[in-house]
Amino acid sequence: QTIIKQLNQNIDSYISYMDNIASVIAQSGDAYKYLYSEKGYGATKDENYSEYRQRLVEQFKTILKGRADIRNIGIVREDKNTPSLFDNGLSVRNTYVDLNTQPWYADAVGKYDRYNLTSSHVQNVIKGERPWVITLSRGICNYTGTEAEDGVVFLDLNYSAISELCAQSSMGDKGYVFILDQNGNIVYHPQQQQLYNELQTENISLVMNAESDIVTAESGDDEKIYALSRSKTTGWTIVG
């Protein structure tokens, strides 16, 4: 139980650090001016607009250079014809993706008081890319006086970043750690592929409905003891 609680604290600290990065971008004058400027998409010849973009690109590049665990950084709006910006400024939006079907976007847009955090998923908002990531996102407030409020900043965190944190928590020869989000979706599991292929199972409903920090699942001769730690910061449940 102590190991699980410590891991929970480590993950909370990690996610809070990443949210600090997202918050700096979300509150940046360059970000909201770039996304919401009335000149918008056709303003690339405007001197100030080009400066907003260049400063954002340099900021993104600096972050990516210092954090190998961040796969992508981007700011985007719902409309495919409005500005977006990813990574080093060369990546292009995948126009076939409806952002309203993407939880990292739909659950963050218009919300400025806290971040949104997804379970592990395939990120396909950038053309030609399909990395397996966990996405942290925030709404970007519009201070330009126009009515649009659909901008979002997102950080795609490499799945390996969370798996490495979990791997550092030794649970003995047969023990292991996995993570569920607030809806019971799997964020991380060491045998995630086997779970998707139904070659392995976990009693997720038992875990999600547990009223104590330790629950026992029995299945024939097999008995599993789950130790739980729920995070008020991320909404995730760490299970070992």
Question: Can you say where each PLM-predicted feature lies in the sequence?
Answer:
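Juxtamembrane extracytoplasmic/periplasmic/luminal helical "stalk" adjacent to the first N-terminal
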Residues: 1-41, 66
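Amphipathic alpha-helical bundle/coiled-coil segments
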Residues: 12, 98-102, 156, 181, ...
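Extracellular/periplasmic juxtamembrane segments that couple receptor/chemosensory ectodomains to their
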Residues: 183, 192-240
